Amino acid sequence: MRVLVLLACLAAASASAISGGYGTMVFTKEPMVNLDMKMKELCIMKLLDHILQPTMFEDIKEIAKEYNIEKSCDKYMNVDVVKQFMEMYKMGMLPRGETFVHTNELQMEEAVKVFRVLYYAKDFDVFMRTACWMRERINGGMFVYAFTAACFHRTDCKGLYLPAPYEIYPYFFVDSHVISKAFMMKMTKAAKDPVLWKYYGITVTDDNLVVIDWRKGVRRSLSQNDVMSYFMEDVDLNTYMYYLHMNYPFWMTDDAYGINKERRGEIMMYANQQLLARMRLERLSHKMCDVKPMMWNEPLETGYWPKIRLPSGDEMPVRQNNMVVATKDNLKMKQMMDDVEMMIREGILTGKIERRDGTVISLKKSEDIENLARLVLGGLEIVGDDAKVIHLTNLMKKMLSYGQYNMDKYTYVPTSLDMYTTCLRDPVFWMIMKRVCNIFTVFKNMLPKYTREQFSFPGVKVEKITTDELVTFVDEYDMDISNAMYLDATEMQNKTSDMTFMARMRRLNHHPFQVSIDVMSDKTVDAVVRIFLGPKYDCMGRLMSVNDKRLDMFELDSFMYKLVNGKNTIVRSSMDMQGFIPEYLSTRRVMESEMMPSGDGQTMVKDWWCKSRNGFPQRLMLPLGTIGGLEMQMYVIVSPVRTGMLLPTLDMTMMKDRCACRWSSCISTMPLGYPFDRPIDMASFFTSNMKFADVMIYRKDLGMSNTSKTVDTSEMVMMKDDLTYLDSDMLVKRTYKDVMMMSSMMN
């Protein structure tokens, strides 16, 4: 009963928010220049609502019909980009209904031209009118991509809320069986069928809120890596990867955008390395060894079943185990990839790379990592045309795609590797990242090791590190997938969907904790505090040396702290650690706050905005751990504030203004990852301003994880690891207690 009451309240609130908010006429014939934050956000949310079909809002239709881009060239800061776009538009673009693919050169070239028109609009009014025009004419996926990138980089969009990508385009984040069940409920108008609902895990309230249990489906397992699906397929983790690309698109090489003055290359490099470090910790929870780098001349043992259904109705292709990677069909691609990788590696060894135009890129100093990372990950072209940036990571992903079978230029069926929203789901992408990060490791190994003076902080001593008990658990989350459904004529006329669809998933989380650090100082001084979490033992149970695990240290926090003379007790809550986002706000929740006359919602969204652009999911701060406790180590180093170690073209002030500060990038010019980014001379390493501490990470017993919840999930089909990797008993109804008894016997 409590479940129905809770869901009914949610449905009522959602319906009220949508009808009250989206029904507001925000697009007008008068200039939309002086709109407040609330109205701007309403504009964005209406534009991105049900993107797969023409808009249901009359104000958007009217603007799209009356506005003429070609006759409004004077309203754009760069007339040439408008002319180039219109020439392309008249020649024909990716049709509506096709899937926009991030690694397809032709489609990406079109998307870049769309972005430039949006970006160079002189003011918010022109920006919105252009977006309305494009919303009704170009491919929905391409529009979302270009519009999102424009919102990330336009100054008049600073602080504005963007719906989470998994709410805009649920197809790339939800298993296909969930989408199919939602369509079934939509077509039958949720006709009562208790037996089928119970079998499929579907709950329907009187207010037509449909909740579909994600886990009530057959799990296809092709390799041992599928046990990690709860982590790799986490919607917030994949959003993090997508937004990382949106902050620094590989094709954005022009200085006009301003991001070339940021530490974009180093940030992208370190983000990839940190993802690998976080994956290593998660694998240790399952006693799995490290990810192996991709090898092109060997059969690929790891297959993958994406379970993703595209809006066109096609399924993302399955990659079988033991696939032969290098074939006669992709020989040219492999030769190009090998040549580019060899050129970069030779450049590291010789200390320079000469580009086709004769300019030389130096790769000798620590700060040169910026240019190296841009060469490898995008942002610095080898050839002159930025639409054809030779992007090594993209070349590697395309090697494993099925592009050679897509004979038509527009009917391209992507693999999971082809999309920034799905690539983390595929175990092979982590192998690609491992190979790419090995390039940076080679560069770092060529640099001098840090000296004792670079490690130490005279007069400062870290005396003790203590933490609360570190406990993880699996919780439930309802994700709104209503935008995956098509609206019928009546719903279009009523400006709202008759039903709200939610996918109920189970995801990794942890209890909040605090880290307490006791520091003695003989002076008052500003300091940079860095906190890392890393392994103590490898997958075989062997004690790891500092050099063995330095690339597996996951950076939890980095912040400025003013030390005073004497004892300093630094207390950091996991909720306040820099670079993590607690939760992506749901669009329905934001709509409710937008309707508040007090403006509390605006303050909430504004405070949350910076983290939404950069934040790693706070839920995934800790690895799963084990019921008996997984032993790891926490490391703290207190360092002086150092400056003057960056390329002269970089501007940390601009990074702060754009909320692009990740880790210690805006508070110190030391390389990201310091002190673990280079091989360590153990004779110089251990100084008084650093300390290791053993910690245990406990996984909460399955029977305890839902004791305080109002939603009764005791009849859910479970399995040994309490996650998403189901066994052959998946159709047998068992209680939590039954499963835990089975689990203990199996252990």
UniProtKB/Swiss-Prot annotation:
It holds the Pfam family Hemocyanin_M. It is found in: Secreted, Extracellular space. PROSITE patterns: HEMOCYANIN_1 (PS00209), HEMOCYANIN_2 (PS00210). GO terms for molecular function: nutrient reservoir activity. Glycans are attached at residues 494, 706. Transmembrane segments: none annotated. InterPro entries: Di-copper_centre_dom_sf, Hemocyanin/hexamerin, Hemocyanin/hexamerin_mid_dom, Hemocyanin_C, Hemocyanin_C_sf, Hemocyanin_N, Hemocyanin_N_sf, Ig_E-set. Fat body. Residues 1-15 form the signal peptide. Keywords: Glycoprotein, Secreted, Signal, Storage protein. SUPFAM superfamilies: Di-copper centre-containing domain, E set domains, Hemocyanin, N-terminal domain. Its main location: secreted. One of its GO terms (cellular component) is extracellular region. Larval storage protein (LSP) which may serve as a store of amino acids for synthesis of adult proteins. Belongs to the hemocyanin family. This is Sex-specific storage-protein 1.
